[in-house]
Structure formats: structure tokens, C-alpha cells
């Protein structure tokens, strides 16, 4: 574990394996093409013109010119290939020994010499020498290039990776192929002759030909043979160009950190750089520059991370479905290798460690039966070198580390068992030893293990316990023998050392010291005999979570040095490296040992963050945590301004600035409401309001700041108002009302347009939209103005005022069925139902993006969050799937959202991941996606099975036009009137014919939507609909994922009872009674007619053609047709006639 061990310039690892090299050389021939795509386009035009000229000059002249060019190409290819081969032959000999600082395997091979933005926006073109004849060519359809690509891909698979430069892999993509002089020669001959000539040029020796062609192309294009990873320096990470974003939402900053994971000190010399984790992102933070670089790639919360001894390589792993292990280059921020399916049986990675030379990675899975794997990640392999399943009686192993001097030895521990591992690579065996310790072992209480390390003497292992003790294990290694195998090594408990009273939380080594950190914030240093050398107990820290020492050795003491003396009899100076301290209360400190200077780098919330709010006209964001802390940041310059920590038991649940930005309303978990001064966080009112017994989830201010309303978990709305008392304006409690039966999802103030008076509305999961009459309310009485039901089956999730894009004022309400509904703000009539963003879960919160100028008033956008994503939606909503975009922001759940006053940034709070993420909004990218998605009905055809030419759309057309015949009479002899429209009365029948069965309420909503669609503008009602509009109505109203078996099961869970087989069922009598008495109940005649059709006694659509009627509903005997007991499966298959898919349980027809 020693941080002092510097990798030598050249060193060969164990078993003859080469280690990685530290030297980096900048590439002198590295210039940027300003517009490679334009140059490529010009080259393409020139090539085509030359082709036309060649055809006009005649075939004979072309043949002669082709022969001359063939000779030139052959001579130049042979000359340059010979030179390159000589250089490569000598270079290979020089590069057989590689050091830990240089990437091996997939890392060097996967990276190209480009910036992040170019890799996305420019098709990953390599950079070429400006001013030379080398250009980017898009003409790669010739036989030679195709063959070269095939040859290279084959060669990369079978050759040693150190013998292939990253540029050779660049050529494997046609878009990356540089042409240089080769392109100029192709311009002067017909393409068929060129292809034949290049086939003639193919060398007989395949390998020599590949090397020769690759080297020739590289030399002509001016491509460096070094990748960005291998040629970079430590300073490049924070010098990357900030190019135009290519995503609508781009992470720019992350507030907070996961204090349950370590923080690493990865650089110190000229810049103090830390590594820590926020949610699913690893953060490289430059303290001096106040910059962050985000390592994004995980879809789940990062569960563990580790770094190499030289701090060059970072490994991160996550927990969850499709978990990943990613190795990063800390100099460039590039992911150099990814391990997929590292634990397919489990739920992710529990613990992870990297060897000091960064060759090997050890992981322990988070599964019921844990698996230890060792990965040779530098070889880009997809499977571990060895694996070991651990018995469950060993407990959950949550910590692992390698022997710093032997890559083949590891130690891990759970709370009750420490395990020693010995890796026999030649045997593909991971031997282990895990003696059981009990109180009888030492006749003393041992305590629960926290961390284990290898002793400095390398013959022992130390395990720290939460009782302040160290268990010393002796390692018994059998003597080495070349002829016979003498058994595996094992460990035995040697002694129990009671070091201190406080529980030890961190155990590590540095230089010649053994270091401990404990629950009281003490840091102690011991020598190899476990005699104390020095300690820091006066720092007043929380429980130590992590200690990370600088990779730079301590400077030797001078006359100006102020190192403290150690506690030995000699009293020598205690010379130690600087180090980073992370504590369990989410604080990070830097300790400069020369002079013992402790600097607080940051203190973040140590508990869930649920409340955030942006200032209405300044770049400020207030962040509230369940731990009782409110912090205010300037989010433009990323500067922490001020904070307040409330007394224990007060957790911040909700925050809102008032419209003037002078006040900050804060709701707490135990029901208290504070009104704070926005610039000092001091109490604005003498005493907080305590009118609720449960957590205050919502706070809202009226537009004139005369009213403040709150909602809590007991479904209660409370109103406070500003009054004048003794010449001073003070806040007073007005009234409260338990107006909902289920949780309140939104609390919203509005304005009456005719009087400019505030109006207050609340929305609950009980499907009630309630408006309150503030003017008629008085002390202890909150008057209700009206109550409206918003939906039938789905429940509402949030609401917001729809921006004035139309002459009609709307409330926008999202529901759990992925729908967005527009309600008239006055009548509360549902005026439109539209398909909203469907990204795995419904929208939970939404806000209208503020405009930045008056010119943007007619182009508005929504920002929304669902369970784990943040997204944008272009208004007006019309069901076009291309008008929305989303990105994962907090995999374990989003707790809150805020938008900056200028609409440039969105902020998301991650709840229990203790982080807030700032997202830069780039609307032009989203608009570009819409334009690429097509116009008119093109985006909507993609929502149909088979699209515009599919079977489903053809059936829809047939039913649409058949409904015209039906409305005119099936048996009529009059001349048919063919039209592009059908009357509205036919719409429900066509809907049902294509598999969508809307309720009567939904049918009324559809009729209102169509009838009044143009009423505000024209004053006319619409009584017909054409096919394109019908298609949009159908797609916007139908369930986005169809009818599923799980939905039927949920209904039977509510209505049924558990039968003798353990399934939910409904008795036949109850089933029939429910159909005629509950919900939108049928008449008995309607029910019998439906059963007649379902049982095949009458053909489908028989009422449209009365002549086909054979059986009346009254003639059916339901006792004979229906079973006594109906389960969900019987209802779906035997009654409705549906088929159930085997895998997902979804209905098919």
C-alpha cells in the first residue's frame, strides 16, 4: 500500500509480463484541420470532375496513364514500406519493456487523437498536417481499401497489441481513412482500372503487405503513431476545449459527493486534484482551478472505485442491472477498457482493488453467493483470469486489497471473516484461507472487522476491528519447489493487539508507517512493531471514512520546515506526505504535514437531498438536505456562498424562493415551516409555523408574495398571508384543510386575468383538482371553490400553467399513463389528451422553461423529470416522439428539480445519492433532432407497428373507409358518397375495431377535443375527422404500451379473492354483478349482447349488418358459458380470446 514506491523507468513484471511505460512524448506533427468535412466535400467534387474528364479523353489514353501511375505507386509504396519496416523492427525491440505509466492492451488501441467534441460531431476524423497534400477522403469504395480494412481487422485480433498503433485501428473505419498522395493518384484514372491496379499491387506476403500499406498510408497522412492516451500529460484533462454541446442536456457540475465511498488524492505537484463519486458519475476535481471533469458511463449508482499506485488508472464499478466495470485514464478522462457482465448472477460489484503496477483488477460481486474475480484488464479480455465462489458463511465481503509487493496475493474481509487468497496463475487456481475467529480464540472480544492489509514485513496480515483492535495473522507459505507441489499457503491468527479504545474505520500503510483512522476522528501512525509514532487527535474531525496520501514523497526537512516531532525517545521529526481526509459527515480536508495545516476543502450534506430552488433573477441555487443543512451556491462561478444548519431533527424537505427573491420558504420533515431571508438564511418571522404533524412536501408563493401555501404528507393544504401589524409586515397563519384523500402532487398559484387576484389549486393522486377561494377564506377556514376529476384509471402526477401559446388559457396535467392533458383554466374541461414523454416511467415534475428574450415567447419548452431521468419537451405537445429528449440523471431516483431564471440550466436533486446535478440546456440540438425526424405524419408513422407501409396501417385505412359505408347504410342502393372524412359518431367504432377500447368518458374527451379544436379561433364546431387527424387522435389516446397482462392481474388483485390454488379469482355471480353495477356499468342487454359476440354466437359487427344476426343476447345461458370461478388467465384467454406471450405476459390477439 506504500505510496512512496516510484515505478522505475524500465522494469519487467512477474512471469515475464511487460509492465506499462511512464514516458510520454508530445506529437510534434499534430495540427488541427479547421473544417475537415468541407475539405472532404471539395475533394469529392474534384474527384468526380476528374472522372468525367478521364472518360472524355478516351480509353486508350486512360490505360496509358493508368500504367504510369501504377509504376509510380509501386515504387513509392516499396520505398516507404521498406523504411517503415526497418524503423518498426528496431522500435519493437526497444518497446518490449513497458512501464506502469503507459496504457496497455485495449487502452492504447481504442483511443484516437481527437477531442471529445470531434469524436461526436465530425465522424471521428483523424487530424492531418495542414498545408500538405494529405486530405480527408470520402472515396473509399475501391477494392484496395476494402481489403485493407479486412486485413487490418484480422491483424488486430491476432497480433500482440503493442505492435499495432492506434492509427492502424483508425483506418478500420472508412470515415477515418486519410488519403494523402494516394487520393491524388486515384483522381487521374478510371475507378475500375484503379481497382485492378491495386489488386495487382497486393504483396504476396500477407503480413508484410499489411504493415507496408498501413505504414505508407500513415506516413502520407501525417498521422502520429501514438494515441492520445499514450502521448498525453497530467495537465491535459482540464485544458480540453469546451466545444458546442452535442446533447440537449449536458452535465456541467455536480454538487455533493457520496461520502460512503473513498476520496482519492490523485495529483498534487502544480495542482491539487481529487477523485470522488456523485451518484453514477466519478468526479475529477481540481481544487485550485475549481474545475470538475466528469467520468460518465455508468447507468447505475457507482458502488466502488479504486486507483493505481501512480494514480494514472481509475477503476469504477456499479450495482444494478447490466452492471459495468470501467477503467479510465486519469490524464485524459478516456475510458480505456470496459468489462461487461462482470457478475451476471449478481447485482453488481461490492468491492474492488487494483495491483500497484495496475496490471490486474480484483472484484467481489454483490450477490448471495459472492464471487471473487481477477481480471487481466490490460489484455482487453472479456473473461476473468480466475474466479472463486465464496461460501455464504464467510459473510458479505466488503473490502479487498492486493499485497503491494506481490500481485498474486490478496486479502478481503467481511464483518466477521478475513480471507487470504493466493493466485496460482499457471494452475488457474485462486486458493484461499479463512480461519474462523471466536471469542475463545484469544479469550477476548474481537469485534467486527472493518479493513485488512498486508503488514510491512510481508509475512503477516492485519485486520482492524470496530473495538479498536488489530488481529495479526501469520502467513504460512510452503517452501518453493520446482519438482513437487507442497500445498497452498494459509493464514493463522497470531495475536490480538488492543491499539486503542475507539473503533478503527480505516487501516492503510504509507512509507514505513501503518496508519489508522477511527470513529472519533483520530489519525494514528505506527511502526512495523505496532508502536505508536505520531497521531493527530486535535483536528476535531468526524469519523474517518478515507485517507489518501499524495503520490509525491514528502520534501526533506530544511531550516524553514515545521514538521512536528514524533513521540519516540529520540524525538525525530515526523516527516510525512500531505494527505486527504474524508469523513463520514461528508467533509473533505487537506492536511499539509509541514506545519500541520488543515484546510477544509468542502462540506456537503451527509443525508438525502430532496429540496432545491433557484433564485428568480440571480444565479443562485438553494439546496436543502434531510440532515438539516441549507446551502446556497452561485451556480455560474461554482462558488459556495453561505449555509445554515438547523437543530437536530429538522430535515429540509421543500424549498421555494418568493417571486421577488427576498424570501426563502422552507418546509421540514417534522412539519415546521420557516420563512427565511434569502440572503442570510436568518428567520424572517420571529417563530416558525408549526401547524402540521407530517413532512411539508410543497411550498408555493403567490405572484404578489401576499400568500404562501404549503402541502404535507397528511393530504392537507395550509395557507399563510402577509399582513401589517404595528406598522410592520408580518406573516400569519390563515387556515388549513385536509382536502385530499391521497398524496398531494402539485400546489400551484395562478392569477385571475380579470382581477389580477391570486388563485390557488392543488392536485392529488386521488384524481381531484381542487381550487380554493382565497378571498372568501378567513381565519381557520379555507374555502373550496370547485372540485374536478381529472382522470379515470390513471392518477395525475404534476401540473403547471401552460404558456400562452394559444388564445385559450390551459392547465397542463401529466398522469401515470404517460399522457399530457390540457384543461381549460376556467371550466376545467379536458381540451386535449396527448402522448407525453415515455422513458420508462411517467413524468413526476415539470416546469416551463423561462424565456430569455421577447422573441422566444412563441417557442416554449418544458423541463421534466421522471423516476430517474431529466428531459426536455418542445411545446406545443402534439405526440411527436422526436420533440422530446431525456438522459439518466440519478439512477436511484430523482427527488426534485429546479430551473435557472434565464432558462440556461436545469438542476436535479438525487435524494439518497446526496447530490445535485447542474445541466446545461442546448435547445438547438433538440430542434435539430425534430427536423431530422421528419415532417407532417412521418414521426407518427414510426409509432405504428410496421410503419406507413405496414399491415396495421392498411387495416386502419380499411376500417376508416368501411365506416363511411356503414354510416351511409350497408344495404343502401343509393350512390355512395366517397369522402376523406368520417362523422364523429363513427370514431369510437373504428377505435375499437383496431384494438383500442376507450371508456365512455374518454370518448367524450375525444369528442370535445375534436369539436372545440378550432372554436376559439373560428367560433365553429367540428363534426367530422379525416384519416391523418384520426391517426393522431388514436396514437395520443391509446395506451402507449398497449394492454398488458399485468394490468389485468392488478384489477383481479383489487376485485378478487384468493382461491384454493393461491390465485386471485372472481366468482361468476360477482363478475356479472360488477359489470352491471360498478364503474361505467352496462345494461343487462348490453352485457348479454357482448357475451354473444365474445362466445362466437354472433359475428363481430353484427349490429352493423342486422341480417347476419342469429342469436339474441337474451337467449344466452351465462351459467353454461362462464365457469364458476374466473381468474385473470381465464378472463384473458377464454372470455376475451386473447393470447398471452410467454416471456413478458403481455396480451396479444
From Swiss-Prot:
Gene Ontology terms: biological process: cilium movement; flagellated sperm motility
Chain segments carrying region Disordered: 1-138, 161-219
Repeat (WD) residue spans along the chain: 335-377, 385-425, 436-475, 493-528, 531-591, 595-635, 641-678, 688-724, 731-774, 785-825, 831-877, 883-921, 959-999, 1019-1059
Tissue specificity of this protein: Isoform 1 is highly expressed in testis and, at lower levels, in lung. Very low levels are detected in kidney and brain. In testis, expressed in spermatozoa (at protein level). Isoform 2 is not detected in testis, lung, kidney, nor in brain.
Keyword Cell cycle set for record: no
Keyword tags: Cell projection, Cilium, Cytoplasm, Cytoskeleton, Flagellum, Repeat, WD repeat
Polar residues composition-biased segments: 112-122, 166-176
Biased composition (Acidic residues): 16-26
Listed Low complexity bias regions: 93-104
Gene Ontology cellular component list: axoneme; motile cilium; sperm flagellum
A Pfam family it matches: WD40
Location of the protein in the cell: Cytoplasm, Cytoskeleton, Cilium axoneme; Cell projection, Cilium, Flagellum
SMART domains: WD40 (SM00320)
Basic and acidic residues: bias regions: 1-12, 31-59, 67-89, 182-215
Reported disease: Spermatogenic failure 33: An autosomal recessive infertility disorder caused by spermatogenesis defects that result in multiple abnormalities of sperm flagellum, including short, bent, curled, thick, or absent flagella.
Function, as annotated: Involved in spermatozoa motility. May also regulate cilium motility through its role in the assembly of the axonemal radial spokes.
Protein name per UniProt: Cilia- and flagella-associated protein 251
Gene name of this polypeptide: CFAP251
